[in-house]
Amino acid sequence: MNTIIRLVLILTVFSNLAYSSSIELTSPNKIGNTTIKTQRFGGSTTIITEDEIKTSGAQSLGDLLKQVPGLSVKQTGGRGGLISIFSRGNESDHNLVIIDGVKQNDVGGSFNFEYLSINNIESIEVLRGPMAGFFGSSALGSVIIINTKRPSDKTEISLMNSFGFNQSFKKDTVGQTDGGIFFVNEQAISVSGPLNKDSNDINIGYILSYERIDDDGYRIFNDAFNNKVLNAGINIVALDDKLKIQTMVSDRWATVRYPTSSSGGVGAYSSVSGTQRDWRHLNSRSINTSYEIYENSSLGFDFSYFFNKRVTRDSGSGNVDWWEKKKTYNYYYEIENYNNDLITLDAKIGYEYLDETSNYHANASSFATDYGHNTYIDSIYSMISLNFNDSAFADIGIRKDDHEYHGSKYNPTVFLSRYMSSELKLRGGYSRGIKYPGIYETYSATSLDPEESESYEIGMDYENTLYALSLTLFKSKTDNMIAYRSSGSPSYRNLDEARSKGIEVSGLFKLQNELSIKYWLTYLETKAVNVNNTVQQNSYNYANWQDDEALLRRPKTSGGLIISKRHNNLYVSADASYTGGRWDYQNSSTRLYNESFWDFGLYGDYLFSSDDLYQSKVFIQVSNLFNDKREEILNFTSPGRTAMIGFRYDTSK
């Protein structure tokens, strides 16, 4: 209650600061299905556009997210291996991932970003910090919103084809690599446009896209990765633009193979009993409808469905099959751009119901019935965005989540920003987040409390025609963290607590002759706290939790830069990223220091044909340019150099 009172007082003072000289801003887009408008938001947000994706030289979503300050991105081995993201010191299962409006985290909160191809993405929105007031449960460390290409009002065709090779390191002491070359190729096609271009009563647009990746890996043993993605969508606008319906469907099939023993260890050939295979089928569907009942106000209904089937096979006894289904129903009333002489208001109130089911397949193993569950979370929420004379802004959200077994939680979120001039914005805020226990954790511990986080931040953004700078200072804490302990009962308990603070910096220099430098830097301090009982100090996972010691896999310093140059039809960029030293674990009770490393990449394209109707270019991209051997995660050697050459064609008419 004291926190709420303080926030109300801050907001009251803040509203009085709004001055009358209006600053002309471009029309900002909304973030996700909220009232937040990008350019006016007081929180830490990074938007990655389609053009930035195409010219980044990135092979995966993980490569793109490494450029976001505050995120520590780590990958286990080669392409297809698990990509974990630690946002501002939080755990890797504290990131809420939303794709085309569908929440897509695995049971327990984890998400492998490697299963997403980047060829059909229109934009990526990254909100750092807890955001439960706007997005609900699981939004502890960050919210990552991925928008694939949408139906368009004119015919558009996009084609991409590329091929190349992975070059492994010279033969090492455990025989995982031999300096060989392994083939990789990718293709993508997208077609969108109107279905009834000349109709005045109803407008229908469509999109259909397909992508595939075939990567033979980088080691002697088979560690190949295959990925296929099919997306489709339809937009309908009718009744004088009052009725809007959008539906999206996505099917993804991914297989990754990696040489491990049945216990998961990677070692010399003699110790590897076989190649493990992880197969996924992910299907998501969504329909979003809204109807304008009065001017600037509408009723809406969203439905989303997510299915995740996983099969893991190896030559040992570790075969596992499981599936998960999520259905979300969201009903809301929304007001947009309601204004008087002083304030412009956007507001939304709603009710959301999430039904979640998962189970092991009946014939999978002796664990066939251990983890089956069917549970729900129902939520009521409200959010409001206030615009004071186009100079000061407030985004406020509050949400009550009620879990069938783990209780109710209220979570407020407040962010404020003010433009001191057309170039300088000051911002800051307070936010909370929760994550309810996953089914694995609750099998023998039904009384667990949700994990909770709380964060404060303050920052500034400055931009003119020559350079841009963004600076954020933050401080956060996470409580009731759920940990596994091999001794005692139940196995999972609310034991761990953590604190973090840091500075995030990013910016851009625009030099002469279309030369630019983009940069980002993160300084992060983390520590475990209140580790003062024998359960934690003498049990499994103690390596990760030592009192007043840094958390694992979170470097204190990290950053990078991209230098790009355009000359006539030629575009070239070179990137360098730095990951500082960090602690990792050798086993459940022993931690080791993992050394820092640099990663270099190169991208170039040549526009050989372009007019008002189409554009064609060839491109080349190289990752791990100098074929440096490193370990992003201890005991997992990262892949060597990858070089790709390709062709891209885009047309519109």
Give the positions of each predicted feature.
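Short, acidic, small-residue-rich periplasmic hinge/interaction motif at the N-terminus
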Residues: 20-54, 62, 92
